[in-house]
Amino acid sequence: MEISMMESSRWKKILPELLAVILCLGIMCVGISLKEGYHMDELLSFELANARYNPWIVPTQPEGRLAKFVREEIQGDSFPETVSNLTETVKDVLQNRRNSKLLSYKADVYEEPVWISAEQFRDYVTVDGDDAFDYLSVYFNVKDDNHPPVHFMLLHTMSSLFGGTLSPWLGCFINLVCLGITLWLLLRLGRQLADIFSMRERGRQLGILAVLLYGFSTGALATVLLIRMYGLLSCLCVALLSVHVEKWKDHGFDRKNKGLIAVTVLGFLTQYFFLFYCILLAAVTAAGLLCGKRTRELWIYVRSMILAAVIGLALFPFAVADVFSSGRGTEALDNLASGFSGYGARLLSFAKIVADRTVGGPLLAAACLAGVVLAVTAGWHKYQEYRRDGAEKAGQNVGPNAGILSLLIVPVIGYFLLASRMSPYLVDRYVMPLFPLATLLLALLLCYLGKKLSEVCGWTEWATGICLIVWIMAVQGLRLAGYDGEYLYRGYGQQEQLAEEYALLPCICVYAGVGYYENLPEFMHYDSTLLVTAEELADRKDVASVQSLDRVAVLIKPGVEESSVISVMQEKYGLEPEEALLSEGVHGDKIYLFVKTSENVKQE
């Protein structure tokens, strides 16, 4: 009976926090249910995760070299046969090096784009029984990309659990779990920071404010909806901060650093932008430990971070090439080396993104101004102490607050400055880790102001807390209701249904760049698909494979001149547009149904 009462009392204590987290996750689930389509990078994530040893879709090479080798030389009729083939291959590579069968193997490369079947497209982005839980394939795929493997392995796990399925829920569920962990970490940080800043009685309030500010933000929704590694990255940045705050508070950097090392390694293996935050946080921590004369902690902390770097590079040595010699890596480094040219405009663009995705420009600007005023006031008081009591006594009164504030603020500002300079595009994904960190700082400021308000007006902690919570839910709820729809791709479901309706027909996708990735779900329905540029369609030598068609769906991507495609289909292939199936899709696509002309039928 007594145990039951204790359990009931414990649940009552955490009920407000639990309700806040559940409410936020419930809202995110509604958002996921509204997602219909994908950004091309999201579908690239599915391909890197699930296409067996085949990292790219190439119209002239549907099956990659390594994929062909694995299918023909490694995969056996039984597991022992597969192991035997793999063993022989390893021996051959070790003995013959460049002359080994693996390294001299050639893929089937065609002179011009070939028809790719619906089954092949399904194999690109989904998992069946033969390639489920094949993490070695994921590892080999991402070594040719510019990202480390952890998120892709998680996505492959979800796809393996739900074989043959391509659904937003597979990727968004990972982000949803990461969001849940992030919200729990914000609650934990609330208690940690309230204890440090002499607001222990407001620890729960601080955590709940941070949870609602972030969990009700459009930034959290965008992070959950985007099936990339940024939800996991955000979670790991907050986890790293929580570990640092706890160890700073408890003087614990000299013991039990396995969790610190694990979070650091996972972050490195998730996204290289993690290094922005990690290195800055480590530098501030090391400086704080040095200034605080915590020498033993400093050396063990440095040793732990070096060990984390060694483990990360040992697990994924391709990271060095990704950062320093890959296309995306050199682009980022070139951006950094370009100095201040255009930097002001980039800073303003990313500042607007952070404001829009957190609490809005006016509120964030007011919070920053209030923070500056408080910092100046504190600095002035410290200066007065210095003049009155001398440097030694003034230094003794600094306490842990300055160090913790540095841990909270400096890495956030540094990350923002670096991401604004080095990001390839002016989009929200690159600053997503800042959203929970910025809302945590705002929650800390609101909690502090609420405490001062209680002291001045005589309000109870409960009253100020309720007022702040209601205000946050109202403001953030209205902003969330006006979400701009990014990453939802509403209307794409209708386009995919169109592909299902005409599933017996082949499809010709005329694209520019690599825009066909956005349409992979459709290509899983059409009988087969030909991926061509407008020039390739006009100059195609294999005329018969198109000319022989009675009916074909032609998908014209943005950037392609519609009239020229129609002209080529009429004059070269004898096919006339019978019906416009889609005038403008969510990605700007146009789809026509072409049929064989009567003259062409007579000639045959």
Question: Predicted regions: what is each one?
Answer:
Residues D41, G231-L236, A402-V412, S420-S454:
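Hydrophobic/aromatic-rich transmembrane helices and adjacent perimembrane loops
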Residues L170-S198, A239:
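Transmembrane-helix motifs of polytopic, lipid-linked glycan transferases
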